[in-house]
Structures are given as structure tokens and as C-alpha cells.
Design a protein with these regions (language model features):
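C-terminal motif of bacterial Sec signal peptides marking the signal peptidase cleavage site
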Residues: 20-24
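Ligand-binding "clamshell"
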Residues: 40, 106-118, 206-219, 281-283
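Secondary-structure end/capping motifs
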Residues: 240-320
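Conserved C-terminal helix/tail region of periplasmic/extracytoplasmic solute-binding proteins
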Residues: 310-341
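Bacterial N-terminal signal peptides that target proteins for export
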Residues: 1-12
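Bacterial signal peptide processing site
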Residues: 26-29
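Short, glycine-/small- and polar/acidic-enriched structural segments
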Residues: 33-170, 175-178, 185, 194-200, ...
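Pocket-lining segment of extracytoplasmic ligand-binding domains
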Residues: 101, 182-274
Length: 341
């Protein structure tokens, strides 16, 4: 009797364990499938290469913010405003940060269409010319007679005529040569160009490459109303998936906030995905970028865009002759998707 009872007990225990294990495996599998189905695969381009200033996207990925928002994000190095515009409007990427002024130049000249900004990234333009001590450039006027390098698609290069006009530079006396995000700093360090198009936050990275003190000529000294980068998507994607756009934006801005709050940690996360990263230079870039992202004094929330200020930016570009009359903020920005205070 005892043996029969023991046998029944063992069989029941084994069966229960088997059912429990099966149920557990099924649950894990179902959860995995559910998560897999809920994650939309999207491609995100960085603004320009994989420098510290773009670490916030990798932070959002590493911390699971994108996954929590329903996205499986493939982050690829961007090639500047013009290139990013082409790739996003062609449907080869869903999101990318680009300089708002570059977007206005493209839209106002009729070079591109089918895109829309859905969030701000930086509240002031970070466009600049960076040179090195000893190159004979300490003021904008010194750029005359010099050779500068930048990508043809870069907003720094494309906005230069307006900057030159306001800074009293004869743009016809400045020579430009082509470069890529990956080669520009090496070109400057090797003395193959007197200056390069960069963002102001690139100063520490330039110095780490060139082993010399960098001199920065910020465009914002003369163009104070211009925004920096904004988050771009295609008009079609924004129209068809407004809730997804808002979810992605929220996740990205969360990564941006974390990166500004803790640059050192963000730099280490960037290095995990981009092994060639110099963590010290990357963290320094993020530290410099902080005031451009959010001004505590103004109380403007991260991601905000103001239509009146964008209109003033358009007026500046029209006044310098770089874009034709007729462009409005609503043609390039979907304010219904822009984060509110």
C-alpha cells in the first residue's frame, strides 16, 4: 500500500513538474513572441558620424527606452543634413536629427520635399568653423584667403553665405574642399585645410585628434535665432503613424536628457556600440551640448519648437537671398507632434 501510494505521489509530482515547466516555457515563448511582434524595426541615422554629441540615441537603445516604446532601432552613422534628408525621404531610414536651418534651406530652395520635423533637439544652432592655433584665424574676417573643408551636404557649409554676409566676410575669397564626417578632423590636423565645418561641441574631439588648441567661430554669434538639430521623419510616416512618432520622440528625448545629466555614463555607452570612441572627448562634447539642449533660465522644455522663432529664421535666410519667399514654419514642422511644455 505504501509503495503504491509512493508511486502515485511520485508520478503526480513528476506530472505536475512537467506541466509547470511546459507552462513556464510556453509563457516565456509567448512573452518573447509578443515582445517581438510589438517591436517595430526602424532605422535611425545619427546627425553626423558617431561623435559624443550623438550618444543620446545609443543611450536610449542601451537603457531600453526604444524597446519600451515599441521599437527595435538600428542606429547608423549619418552623413549630415543633406544626406540624412535624402535617406529619410527615400524611406531607407525612418528618423534622423538634422539641422533645422539646413532643412529650411532645402525646403525653401525646392531641393527636397516629403519630410517634416517633429521635435527639437538643440535650442540654438551649434554650427561653427573650427580651426587650430597657428593657422592665422582668430576672427571671421581671417577666413578670407583660407581653404576650409566640409561635407557638401553639411549645414555649416550651406549656411556659410548667410553667416559670411552677417559677419562681414567676402565669401568669394573662401575656398571649400570636400570632406566626410570621418576624415574632417584628420584633414585639419594634417594641415590640409585651415579650418573645418563642425559643431561647437566638436572642440574637445578636434583637440584630441590634432593635439593642438582649437579655436571655434560659432555661427550663433551672428545668427542667434536659429535652432540647432531637430528630429526628422518623412511626411508619410508622420501622417500614417502619429502615435508611433510621439512614442519614438519620447524615448529619444529621454536618452537625450540622461546624456546631458550624466555625460560620462553616456560616453561609455557610446563606446560599447562604437569601440573607436574616445570616452573623455565624447563626454566633453555632451557637457558642452547641455546649454544648447535646455536653457534653465528660459524654462523651455527639451524638444520644444516655437513657430514664431522658426518664422524669424526663415526671414533671416530670405533676407540673405538663400531661400525664396513663401516658406512657412507649418510646411516643414508638424507642431501637433512637437513635445509640449
Amino acid at each position: 500500500m505504501y509503495r503504491r501510494t509512493l508511486t502515485r505521489t511520485l508520478v503526480a509530482t513528476a506530472l505536475a513538474a512537467t506541466l509547470l515547466a511546459a507552462a513556464g516555457c510556453s509563457g516565456d515563448s509567448d512573452d518573447a513572441k509578443a515582445k517581438g511582434k510589438s517591436l517595430e524595426k526602424v532605422t535611425y541615422l545619427t546627425s553626423f558620424g558617431t561623435f559624443g554629441r550623438d550618444a543620446y540615441a545609443y543611450v536610449a537603445k542601451e537603457k531600453g527606452y526604444f524597446a519600451d516604446a515599441g521599437f527595435d532601432v538600428d542606429i547608423k552613422p549619418g552623413g549630415g543634413t543633406g544626406e540624412n534628408l535624402k535617406i529619410v525621404t527615400a524611406g531607407q531610414a525612418q528618423f534622423a536629427p538634422i539641422d533645422l536651418t539646413g532643412m529650411l534651406l532645402a525646403a525653401g530652395s525646392g531641393q527636397a520635399k516629403g519630410f517634416v520635423a517633429v521635435s527639437g533637439i538643440q535650442q540654438r544652432t551649434m554650427a561653427a568653423i573650427i580651426t587650430l592655433e597657428g593657422n592665422g584665424i582668430t576672427s571671421p574676417k581671417d577666413l578670407e584667403g583660407k581653404t576650409l573643408a566640409d561635407s557638401p551636404a553639411s549645414v555649416v557649409r550651406n549656411l556659410f553665405p548667410t553667416y559670411a554676409k552677417l559677419a562681414n566676410i567676402d565669401a568669394s575669397k573662401v575656398t571649400w574642399q570636400n570632406g566626410t564626417p570621418q576624415t574632417l578632423m584628420g584633414t585639419l590636423a594634417a594641415g590640409k585645410a585651415a579650418g573645418i565645418g563642425q559643431f561647437v561641441v566638436g572642440k574637445p574631439t578636434v583637440e584630441s585628434v590634432a593635439k593642438k588648441t582649437a579655436i571655434v567661430l560659432p555661427y550663433s554669434d551672428y545668427l542667434q535665432d536659429l535652432y540647432g538639430n531637430v528630429l526628422l521623419t518623412s511626411s508619410a510616416y508622420a501622417k500614417e503613424h502619429p502615435d508611433r512618432v510621439k512614442a519614438f520622440t519620447g524615448a529619444l528625448l529621454k536618452g537625450l536628457g540622461d546624456s546631458i545629466a550624466n555625460p560620462d555614463a553616456a560616453a561609455q555607452m557610446l563606446k560599447k556600440y562604437v569601440p573607436t570612441t574616445n570616452p573623455q572627448a565624447a563626454a566633453a562634447e555632451l557637457t558642452l551640448m547641455g546649454p544648447f539642449v535646455k536653457s534653465e533660465a528660459s524654462g523651455v522644455p527639451v524638444g520644444a519648437l516655437d513657430s514664431q522663432r522658426v518664422a524669424r529664421s526663415i526671414a533671416i535666410l530670405q533676407g540673405s537671398g538663400q531661400i525664396k519667399p513663401g516658406l512657412t514654419p507649418e510646411q516643414v514642422i508638424d507642431f501637433s507632434l512637437v513635445p509640449k511644455a
